[in-house]
Amino acid sequence: MKFFALFIYRPVATILLSVAITLCGILGFRMLPVAPLPQVDFPVIMVSASLPGASPETMASSVATPLERSLGRIAGVSEMTSSSSLGSTRIILQFDFDRDINGAARDVQAAINAAQSLLPSGMPSRPTYRKANPSDAPIMILTLTSDTYSQGELYDFASTQLAPTISQIDGVGDVDVGGSSLPAVRVGLNPQALFNQGVSLDDVRTAISNANVRKPQGALEDGTHRWQIQTNDELKTAAEYQPLIIHYNNGGAVRLGDVATVTDSVQDVRNAGMTNAKPAILLMIRKLPEANIIQTVDSIRAKLPELQETIPAAIDLQIAQDRSPTIRASLEEVEQTLIISVALVILVVFLFLRSGRATIIPAVVVPVSLIGTFAAMYLCGFSLNNLSLMALTIATGFVVDDAIVVLENIARHLEAGMKPLQAALQGTREVGFTVLSMSLSLVAVFLPLLLMGGLPGRLLREFAVTLSVAIGISLLVSLTLTPMMCGWMLKASKPREQKRLRGFGRMLVALQQGYGKSLKWVLNHTRLVGVVLLGTIALNIWLYISIPKTFFPEQDTGVLMGGIQADQSISFQAMRGKLQDFMKIIRDDPAVDNVTGFTGGSRVNSGMMFITLKPRDERSETAQQIIDRLRVKLAKEPGANLFLMAVQDIRVGGRQSNASYQYTLLSDDLAALREWEPKIRKKLATLPELADVNSDQQDNGAEMNLVYDRDTMARLGIDVQAANSLLNNAFGQRQISTIYQPMNQYKVVMEVDPRYTQDISALEKMFVINNEGKAIPLSYFAKWQPANAPLSVNHQGLSAASTISFNLPTGKSLSDASAAIDRAMTQLGVPSTVRGSFAGTAQVFQETMNSQVILIIAAIATVYIVLGILYESYVHPLTILSTLPSAGVGALLALELFNAPFSLIALIGIMLLIGIVKKNAIMMVDFALEAQRHGNLTPQEAIFQACLLRFRPIMMTTLAALFGALPLVLSGGDGSELRQPLGITIVGGLVMSQLLTLYTTPVVYLFFDRLRLRFSRKPKQTVTE
């Protein structure tokens, strides 16, 4: 009593306390960062190594394996995958959430150093690492185009000046430059001319290397002067290499230009990038795992004007893709939804209380509670994101509930003629414990979420804490500011005021009278209600088992990614044509705004595309509908497949794949894996629950297998080293020398001119100089035949791995797909030597599925414990919790009705319902217990009176929660696919719960009261206290 009186009779102090809460919240709001979702990125580090010309199997055994053994010893590595292709190896290390990325990077560098002695000596550089996940979609893509500059010059400018500058911006983890390669002097050899002159490829390589050196020459000095010695020991352009003497034949000089075509070109000609049908260099910018995407993008945009000034006028720098506009639009939609929810909740209060003065009170209390929450969010290091703003939207209904319970009870005393200050004090005292019980039991629902580990726990923690803080502030404000405002603002009702909104008032009275009559009938037929309650419990179980499930709702971020996979023997020229064809098909779609893509590098038969869709208000289809439409058109393109997927804000794992979900096959027996992977992939491709099934195992690449006759080689004076060097010199784009320039270093690349390698007969023109100086054709000591070879070799841990990727067809859920895959694996009878498991997001889904039921049970148990402590009873918490089955049925039926799968967002809705629907029972039970203690009523009379007296606040709180969630259901625009499942779950649960719990709660109350009396040692005792 004294606590409430302290605030009621000191209005200035109470107002200033509320102002302080509001001011702190405003300051916190201004400093909160903006993000699509809470920070849930795993720390990921990518290690890269190269050995030009080495086969995928050579890279895997000689480069990947030594590095994996060393990197695998690092603490906190949750997953290690590697992919080795022609001349390159990439190892992805994913760490535990709590692992510091900088500390992990130091450990990675130490592991690389430890493995250095085990790596091949011919590697052009040491392995490097980057603190970025290559499988993440870029947060921004910049393109460079020009009508005058070559692709090599554009690439040089991008990699030398733009990429380093952008990499220094806070939050940027990696800037990947694609579409070409650095400038280089290319030496294209003529095998026949070399043979005629008696010059070997090694002779050419040695001559070029010796002619271009960069060594210190020292200095000269006398008594007064000092001269630095400088020589013309470097050759920098193709024109300078052309006249280089590489050999003497019969006294005549053989110059490089006599046996080769020397051009200023690029290091790797098998690279191509495009933007909207125009050749382009792409700068794909990815953020650090812990960075905020909006802040990083804003920093890059702020830097762009400065970068524009350094660019020649003939180079056009454009933003081809930016993730931030859809994120901002999504957050604006949530903010609008929040405002609408507040307005609707206040409207509910006005309709029920029929007083403008009374309505002002929640109109003040709700903003104070919500705004004050921003301060706590800032102190906790949270951000303004879809989940935290949705938590505040839902909190609108919760925070007004506390105010409604206090306000309605005070209003009831005022209507009975009590003076305002006395009514405020008496009304608050009566419901203070009720409000405390409602708030504490609601916060208790989220305690299991705070203890939940892994990605789901990290994702839900921000939601739970934000909502809990809002409820805590609401509890404080409702017991301080609300009674003070009631005492000083409200007046005793007058007859003319009671006539306002007569229609709604009469309707409410009629509803209450009808409810009273129906409740009397129900209390006389309790067994029937018991059967209904048991039926809802059984229906809950059946609906949960049968409803489709997924991890997270499919988002429409306005960005698509596409992976091209062509025939494994395709040439680069043909692959570039496929890229152009696919880009034209997509560019012609009316919903597409921009298309960029690239192909080439170590995997000639693959490519990537990044597609920006038009804003949601300029297109009628969702991203998935656009993908479905494009899939039909793209399927008509022969010789290649383009797999499209919508970019999501949550992506788990470091595997780069052509689809959203992965299923990984592991084996220590590589032969068994290669045997069973095609069988499994073909089987999965027939399943209607899966779409776009593809694999990263490609074993049918064209290979030319050379078999040396070692006896013949020994007789001819040729060793294997010389023969292998010949092949590397001829076909490996071998980097044989370095050209040093002020801004960068460039390479001299030697190979047989592509004009002479158009078919297999090119091998017949190759020759080796033996130890006697004679030219011996390769065909003298080697035979060759075409064969199949892998284009890549993949590992997970230290086991051979193959990952099958898939998307979900429209109308199918991840639970449907995972169940279908499990059935297919069983039907195929896959041997135990080949192990299959879900990876990435699909793996997290499996883990979440296993913990969902435990989480719900833990939440219910926590609420039971809190209620038991508050009521000092084992029984009354069960009465209150009996409201939950009907809410679960309503939520699951609503999801089924809207064809929405049960996702992590729907799970949040279920957890919220546990907290919401029990409020009705708390109000009933509190007043029934009070009536039994002080009114000398029987249990049946007490619960009946409690139901009627609390009918109005029950309706008010339920409608407030319902109207607070309704905008989530009806919202459209960006991010609606996240908001709608939450709103659907809450609205469906509230409607069903309201229909049933008004009858089931009093029946359960009476049932447990009879049970208590039956087992009580003191039968005459009426109430358990």
Curated annotation (Swiss-Prot):
It is a multi-pass membrane protein. The keyword Mitochondrion does not apply. One of its GO terms (molecular function) is xenobiotic transmembrane transporter activity. Keywords: Cell inner membrane, Cell membrane, Membrane, Transmembrane, Transmembrane helix, Transport. It is found in: Cell inner membrane. It comes from the Bacteria. The chain crosses the membrane at residues 3-23, 333-353, 360-380, 387-407, 431-451, 463-483, 528-548, 853-873, 875-895, 897-917, 953-973, 984-1004. The keyword Transport applies. Induction: The mdtABC operon is transcriptionally activated by BaeR. GO terms for cellular component: plasma membrane. The MdtABC tripartite complex confers resistance against novobiocin and deoxycholate. Belongs to the resistance-nodulation-cell division (RND) (TC 2.A.6) family. MdtC subfamily. Part of a tripartite efflux system composed of MdtA, MdtB and MdtC. MdtC forms a heteromultimer with MdtB. This is Multidrug resistance protein MdtC. It comes from Escherichia coli (strain SE11). The gene is mdtC.
